């Protein structure tokens, strides 16, 4: 189901949903700054708030994610200089509507797709960066710990790696015969003592682009010591969501729990668009989460 917006013909790529004081906010990828929406009802109309975060001389703001910490709001996103690479940044605000100010670059290397989590053991940052050493080289999921919202501890722990051809982003990307794989868009949550780590795999322009997940039943709050197992169907590729007869490019989502029900907010394109506009737009579906199993009702 598509979300409803009070503006037309706008993309909502990489949608991140956030609830605060009875209102819901959605932060999305955009070229000139992080854009945001708000609503009182996620199934009702969303109001466009405009651009809520920019950094001087930076472009291409990807995959924003927000956390409330000690009564302030911290927005994590990647951006780049015109001829540079994507680097994760953080900015802060006194309101979820922004403006988000005081930007800081967290890493000098290529890093994207943050998800910040607070547990009893502290603040953790899931993100994506590259590993060129393995056979299935490419972008993988990593974990860091934060001493505060602005200060990474540089654990650089790789926590999930590619294992399927469906996770190939581009064949022979570097010209050496090896295929580039991509895992991105990490989203972590815990339900009934099971840790879930959802992600997107592959290339968003390909039919195999999908949402999958890994899980751990370990009774730990220090996330750096968890060992995640990718969900499969007896070792075979088994995504939660992938292209169907209605939508394609299905991926990069966030999750919210409302009245004991889980929902994924994700982006996709229409297989049969009704207009010339067919960019990635935000959609919602229910997730069934139980005993280490996640299924989607689309």
Q: For each of these PLM feature ranges, what is it?
A:
Residues 1-298:
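Carbohydrate-active catalytic/glycan-binding domains of CAZyme proteins
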